[in-house]
Amino acid sequence: MTFEMLYSKIHRATITDANLNYIGSITIDEDLAKLAKLREGMKVEIVDVNNGERFSTYVILGKKRGKICVNGAAARKVAIGDVVIILAYASMNEDEINTHKPSIVLVDEKNEILEKG
């Protein structure tokens, strides 16, 4: 049996851009994404702290430092400056659950890393 468990989280990131005309996804600063163990194309859930919206999309790695841009139709669910939580889950068996520790990255309002847990 497997269970859906928290794999990683970027906590309180700030939306820096929203691009309605892009195909889809969320663009995340590559250094920040890698620190959170997020991979290109990985499914993530976005929770908007400001408006309560919750939606799923996939990761695109961005080159610009601090960039968090929601693309495509999901751009209508956020506003620039909104604070979001970016979550990734993984299916794990009981042995994996016992040894797994989620990667949690806390950032400030400029998406600079405050703490990595």
Curated annotation (Swiss-Prot):
GO cellular component terms, semicolon-separated: cytosol
Keyword terms, alphabetized: Autocatalytic cleavage, Cytoplasm, Decarboxylase, Lyase, Pantothenate biosynthesis, Pyruvate, Schiff base, Zymogen
Recorded GO MF terms: aspartate 1-decarboxylase activity
One Pfam assignment: Asp_decarbox
Posttranslational mods: Is synthesized initially as an inactive proenzyme, which is activated by self-cleavage at a specific serine bond to produce a beta-subunit with a hydroxyl group at its C-terminus and an alpha-subunit with a pyruvoyl group at its N-terminus.
Residues annotated as binding substrate: T57, G72, A73, A74
Cofactor(s) in the UniProt record: pyruvate
Record-listed Pyruvic acid (Ser) modification sites: S25
One of the GO biological process terms: alanine biosynthetic process
Pathway(s) per entry: Cofactor biosynthesis; (R)-pantothenate biosynthesis; beta-alanine from L-aspartate: step 1/1
Catalytic activity: L-aspartate + H(+) = beta-alanine + CO2
Enzyme active site: S25, Y58
Record carries keyword Cytoplasm: yes
Gene3D superfamilies in the cross-refs: 2.40.40.20
Subcellular location: Cytoplasm
HAMAP family: PanD (MF_00446)
Family: Belongs to the PanD family.
Name this polypeptide is given: Aspartate 1-decarboxylase
Lineage: Bacteria, Pseudomonadati, Campylobacterota, Epsilonproteobacteria, Campylobacterales
Annotated gene: panD
